[in-house]
């Protein structure tokens, strides 16, 4: 059997795709794989802020078209890039183990933490979620909009004379560059910054009629990561969230219970609501929708 896997062409996307392939090969060594690189709109338009060129799905549409047409068998995405609406023919398969969900500050060597940064320090990020949470913690910071892949954004510290940039920890860890960086890494825990819903989780997308693939992908499922994905994406869907407003969520699991913390902000950051809701693990999705209702009431 041969499986053709669609992926974006960035170093991180290919690293993630190959990680999934390696996991499957451990269980099914006889399967052959081919990786097909597909360029997306989000990859091609690098000079405009993400919230200006459209919504979630910017890094996905062209890949989904090839899934539907049968040119590829499955696709590996960062789940946080995925819209909550999916083409009728497609579905997410089983969820593999989540990487670190936190955001990180990559800092100029002079500084070890966000608290050590000087007044009005320049921090690069293109995300409203990151921007407004940073400003909630330290309103003197000067947030500079940046875009690009992981390496490009790290290079902007030198090129644009920044004190630091914010990235997803998952990307740094998957690329395995934490040791090689000539910068300090400061992890932003969830009391400073809630991650994007499903940050650090990979989405394995297939056509609904591919039961043969479902069976194979079940072998790399991680139950807890799956529950987190369901709860956090229910919250995202409930607040009807795209790139235009700050949205964060994290689901913590303790034995048979979950606690979901969600954040929603106005587009200009003038108001940010953060709330938590707990319950039984089997109600994870319901809790996501209920928490969305609570924050929507408050923000309006």
UniProtKB/Swiss-Prot annotation:
GO biological process entries: protoporphyrinogen IX biosynthetic process
Co-factor remark: Binds 1 dipyrromethane group covalently.
S-(dipyrrolylmethanemethyl)cysteine PTM sites in chain numbering: 243
Required cofactor names: dipyrromethane
One Pfam family here: Porphobil_deam
Keywords (A to Z) from UniProt: Porphyrin biosynthesis, Transferase
Its EC number(s): 2.5.1.61
PANTHER family cross-referenced by the UniProt entry: PORPHOBILINOGEN DEAMINASE
Function: Tetrapolymerization of the monopyrrole PBG into the hydroxymethylbilane pre-uroporphyrinogen in several discrete steps.
Record protein name field: Porphobilinogen deaminase
């Amino acid at each position: 059997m041969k499986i053709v896997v669609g992926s974006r062409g960035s170093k991180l996307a290919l690293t993630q795709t190959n990680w999934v392939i390696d996991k499957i090969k451990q269980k099914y060594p006889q399967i052959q794989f081919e990786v097909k690189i597909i360029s997306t709109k989000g990859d091609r338009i690098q000079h405009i802020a993400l919230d200006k060129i459209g919504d979630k799905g910017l890094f996905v549409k062209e890949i989904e078209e090839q899934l539907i047409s049968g040119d590829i068998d499955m696709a590996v995405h960062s789940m946080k890039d995925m819209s909550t609406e999916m083409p009728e023919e497609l579905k997410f398969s089983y969820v593999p183990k989540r990487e670190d969900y936190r955001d990180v500050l990559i800092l100029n060597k002079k500084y070890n933490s966000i608290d050590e940064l000087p007044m009005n320090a320049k921090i690069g990020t293109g995300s409203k979620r990151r921007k407004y949470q940073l400003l909630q913690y330290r309103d003197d910071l000067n947030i500079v909009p940046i875009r690009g892949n992981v390496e490009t954004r790290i290079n902007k510290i030198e090129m644009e004379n920044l004190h630091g940039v914010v990235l997803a920890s998952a990307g740094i860890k998957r690329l395995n560059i934490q040791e090689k960086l000539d910068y300090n890494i400061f992890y932003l825990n969830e009391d400073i910054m809630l991650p994007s819903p499903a940050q650090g989780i990979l989405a394995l997308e297939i056509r609904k009629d591919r039961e043969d693939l479902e069976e194979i992908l079940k072998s790399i499922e991680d139950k807890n990561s799956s529950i987190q994905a369901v709860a956090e994406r229910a919250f995202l869907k409930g607040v009807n969230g795209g790139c235009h407003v700050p949205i964060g969520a994290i689901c913590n699991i303790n034995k048979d219970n979950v606690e979901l913390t969600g954040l929603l902000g106005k587009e200009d950051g003038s108001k940010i609501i953060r709330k938590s809701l707990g319950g039984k693990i089997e109600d994870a999705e319901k809790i996501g929708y209920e928490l969305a209702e609570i924050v929507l009431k408050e923000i309006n």
